[in-house]
Every structure is written in C-alpha cells, then in structure tokens.
Amino acid sequence: MNLEFFVDPNRCIGCQSCVAACSECDTHRGHSMIHLQYVDRPISVQTVPVVCMHCDSPTCAEVCPADAIKRTGDGVVQTARKPRCIACNNCVLACPFGVPKMEAEFSLMMKCDMCYDRTSAGLKPMCASVCPSGALYFGTREEIERQRPRSRPINTFQFGEQTITTKVNMMVPRDGGVAHVDVLSAMDDSAVGRADMLDSVFDDM
C-alpha cells in the first residue's frame, strides 16, 4: 500500500490545529514546522497550510555548501543535520516554496520532514492526524480520489521555465484539466482579481 501526503487548500479553515500538533512532534523541539499562509489577506480570510513539498530534486540540498540536507530513499527531504549545518541561509533563499526556516535558537535550518519517524512506520503525520476538515490528508491515491471525485492530485509545479516535481500532492479541481500548477500565473491571477475587486468597491463609493 503506497501512502501519500495530500494538501487540499480549498478545505483549510484556518483553525491552526496542524500548527499546534506539529510543535508537539518529538523531533521539532517545540517549534512548528508548518504554518498557515493567507492567500489574499486584504480581501479574504482564506488560508492554506504550507508544508515542505519534498521535491524530487530539492533545491535546498543542491545549494547547501555543507551537504547538510539529505533526501531519504523514499523521497523525504529532511531537516539539516546539526553537525554539518553552518546556518548560511542558502536553503532558505533557494526554496521556491519558501519552506525552510533558520531557527536562531539552534543555528539550524529546520523544516517539515513529513513526521518521518511516524510516516516511515505507516502512521499519519501529526498535522494530518488532527486536521478536522481534511485539508491535510495522508493515505492512498485511490482513497482520496474515491472520497473527493471533484478533485484530483497533482505534484508538478511550474515556476516560469522551471518544472518541479514533488512527493507531496496538491488537490486541484478535476474539471480544470491542468497537468501542473503554474505558480507565477496563479500569482498574477490573484493580483488581477484583487485589483478588479478593489475597483468595484471604489466604483460603489
């Protein structure tokens, strides 16, 4: 049985349960490795959980001069290793998803490792085990496609000319017909939508 991690942004209700649970993970030293991002804060309360996407070719590891970031055989990109990490911030700047964070208390880059101590044993990550809306889901592809027939998982992201494939899946509308998430286009669409909404507000004043 191939267990996978899925993020369904449309289901996030901003409750912060995942953030609280993540900080309780034994390997996180009381720090949460997940955070909620406001999609368009000036006009919306919509949030999306931000976890490490565990890239097939992790940029964070590629730019690390100390070879402190390792990827497991099953595709999980791990937190930097303390004896090697020199706190240079290269990984923080290089990640296209903005995930790695430098923890000043430990002089160490720490990030979501998909609760590897749990998932490698077939258990759910802490965040997915407490998410009340199913925005974070750990299970088989067959299960989630059966439960959510209007959505489908994709794990390819386009950043301009760069294509990134990840271990973590993003749920998108099935009728959209997209083969990947065009990140820059989505950001442009968000900006256009915000401008149109603000124009309509001022027109009514």
Indicate where each model-derived feature is located:
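Non-ligating segments of multi-cofactor redox enzymes
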Residues: 1-205
